[in-house]
Regions:
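N-terminal amphipathic/basic leader segments beginning at the initiator methionine
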Residues: 1-36
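Short acidic-hydrophobic, aromatic-tinged amphipathic segments that line or gate anion-handling sites
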Residues: 29-38, 99-108, 206, 336-345
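Glycine-rich phosphate/diphosphate-binding loops that line cofactor/substrate pockets in enzymes
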Residues: 38-55, 74-78, 223-231, 259-261, ...
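Short glycine-rich or small-residue beta-strand-to-loop segments that form or flank ligand, phosphate
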Residues: 50-62, 82-85, 233-235
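Histidine-anchored nucleotide/phosphate-binding helix
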Residues: 57-80, 249-260, 267
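Anionic-ligand anchoring segments at beta-strand to alpha-helix junctions in alpha/beta enzyme folds, i.e.
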Residues: 70-100
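Conserved, well-structured core segments that form the ligand-binding/active-site neighborhood
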Residues: 99-237, 256
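C-terminal non-catalytic interaction/assembly regions of soluble proteins
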Residues: 250, 254-383
């Protein structure tokens, strides 16, 4: 009997499944950078005195690159760089090195005026771990900038979507808008490509160049073609942030949903100890908004894509979750079936589809984009 360990919050839980009931554990192929390659790429980052590093991700890979970057620049005699992170990453970023560097949170004024913040420094570098985004297609510096610093442009990006379905790994109009906005930002970006456990590549250059290259590399490594399946059990992976709120975990569901056949079932491991994680989800479960109001509102509300995706897809798929959130929120308001354990999940799937049913497992869904019936080579088309 194969035993698969899946991350759930801060712990690993075992999926005890018979060999005949396991279709496949879907894992992307990332070839790790060699140590000399890793060091060489960071040597090329042009940081000098009075430089600013804006950290946009909190993955283990991001922390590794940040710590090594600090060691690299201090080894060059650079002693004054400022490191700041997004407020939502509070408690997730620490710098493991022998230097006296620490990170601080961006202030409210910094968030309001990104241009003004950058103008205070000789050089600015954004640091981001490339992933998938259900609205933009890919996540990286440009999408973080719109989501965290540019409310008007975020609303415009949301209005450019062609439907209410998630589109991870797709170059779309929201993606192109994010790129075009960042062309005018006087900064560089470091985009990391890898999964929860390794770094496959690092791109440093203009924001546009780094993001387009990292998007291509990510889909090359993790855009996995699979046959459609009846069921999938989905874990975000071992990066803690993606377990912390329902909003973060739902991104992993949207990465995986396109391999399901009609009326298939996806079960998400989404502990969500930090709550719902977005204003739109909070408003929706509290009855302060509905899908029609969100659709008619010309201003983007944080997390509203998740409400609209759930509404649009509930007739085609069955979604379930293991979570610490109240059942009333999950089941009654959001339409998610709730489970207490993987054993209960497996029992439910076998009762529904038969004792010989085979289950697919995604153990690192934040950095995986399986899909069926789509030519991946034709999918990634940059402007």
């Amino acid at each position: 009997m194969p035993e698969i360990w899946l991350q759930y919050g801060k712990t690993d839980i075992a999926l005890d499944i018979r060999f005949e009931n396991l279709y496949k554990e879907i894992i992307p192929t990332f070839t790790p950078l060699q140590e000399d390659q890793f060091s060489s790429k960071l040597q090329d980052v042009p940081l000098s005195e009075n430089s600013l590093v804006i950290v946009l991700s909190s993955s283990k890979a991001t922390k590794q690159v940040l710590s090594s970057l600090v060691d690299t620049v201090t080894g060059k005699g650079v002693n004054e760089i400022t490191i700041v992170t997004l407020p939502k990453l509070k408690g997730f970023i620490d710098i493991q090195n022998d230097n006296n560097y620490s990170s601080s949170l961006l202030s409210a004024s910094d968030l309001v005026s990104l241009t003004g913040t950058i103008a205070k420094f000789e050089k600015t570098v954004f640091l981001s771990h490339s992933a998938y985004d259900p609205l933009f297609g890919f996540e990286g510096t440009p999408t973080h900038v719109l989501r965290n610093f540019m409310d008007d442009k975020m609303s415009e990006a949301f209005s450019l979507r062609t439907n209410d379905l998630p589109s991870p790994g797709i170059i779309s109009e929201p993606y192109r808008l994010a790129l075009s906005v960042c062309k005018d930002i006087e900064a560089m970006s470091i985009e990391i490509v890898g999964n929860s456990n390794s770094i496959s590549d690092i791109y440093c250059g203009s924001i546009e160049e780094s993001f387009t290259k990292s998007s291509s590399k990510l889909i090359e490594n993790s855009g996995v073609e699979e046959h459609r399946v009846k069921s999938a059990i989905i874990s975000p992976g071992s990066d803690l942030l993606y377990h912390t709120t329902l909003t973060q975990s739902l991104n992993c569901l949207w990465n995986s949903v396109h391999i399901l056949s009609d009326h298939g079932t996806a079960i998400l491991l989404g502990e969500s100890s930090g709550g719902l994680g977005s204003k739109a989800l909070e408003m929706f479960v509290e009855g302060r908004t509905d899908v029609s109001l969100l659709r008619e509102n010309g201003k983007y509300v944080e997390g509203q894509e998740h409400v609209m995706f759930l509404e649009a897809m509930r007739e085609k798929y069955d979604f379930g979750i293991i979570s610490t959130l109240p059942e009333y929120y999950l089941k009654t308001k959001l339409g998610l079936k709730t489970f207490d354990s993987l054993k209960q999940v497996l029992t439910n799937l076998l009762l529904r589809y038969g004792k010989n049913h085979k289950v697919s497992v995604l153990s690192d869904a934040r950095y995986t984009s399986p899909r069926s019936g789509i030519g991946i080579d034709n999918e990634l088309k940059h402007p």
